[in-house]
Amino acid sequence: MSKFELLTKHIETFESDNFGEWFIDKENDGSPEHPIQMPYVMYTRAIDDFIEDVHRFVDQHKEMRLTNYHGVLEERGIDIGEAKQADIEKIDAIGLCALIVANVRAERFCDGAILSSCKDGTLLKWLNKLRSFDEKKPLDEVIKRIEDSKKSSTSTSSNSKPQRILEKSKISDGR
């Protein structure tokens, strides 16, 4: 499993238009006998699974300090109130994870925060960008291995062609 797959496996969920719906109490009149229940969002099972996986991801990756998502975003110059407008091309993978966690945690204080980010495509955009970090990683590893092999071959190869030419010229000069 790739590093961010626990989150990015949900991309297909966000490509649909079925995320959940608002529950609005229309049966009760607000009297003491029939108090009105505050509106809330009933998310689909797929969105509930995503929310659970976000929490699981935070627990599994303590090195990212995502429990302090606010601090992680501040370190990257991202104002949590402007998170949806953040330029994701300039944000690293940990910053993207912090944006996702912030959005999920916002639901506790603002019903419908996740639904809004589903409908406007914000979560889909963040998850697609996060997936690009997983896709880029194998290429980065290949490049690093090539560079490492070049370094080791030049440092271990004392009989390289330029080295041999230099040695031959020293012999012919009598040095």
Question: What annotation goes with each model-predicted range?
Answer:
Residues 1-59:
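Short terminal alpha-helical segments
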Residues 19-24, 63, 88, 105-117:
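Charged, low-complexity interaction regions
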Residues 23-41, 69-88:
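Extended non-catalytic scaffold regions that mediate assembly and binding
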Residues 43, 47-72, 76, 114:
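Compact disulfide-stabilized, cysteine-rich extracellular microdomains and processed peptide cores
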Residues 46, 65, 90-95, 122, ...:
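Structural recognition of alpha-solenoid helical scaffolds
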Residues 87-105:
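Short amphipathic alpha-helical heptad-repeat segments
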Residues 99-144:
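Amphipathic alpha-helical binding modules
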Residues 146-148, 155, 161-175:
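Non-Sec secretion/translocation targeting segments of pathogen effectors
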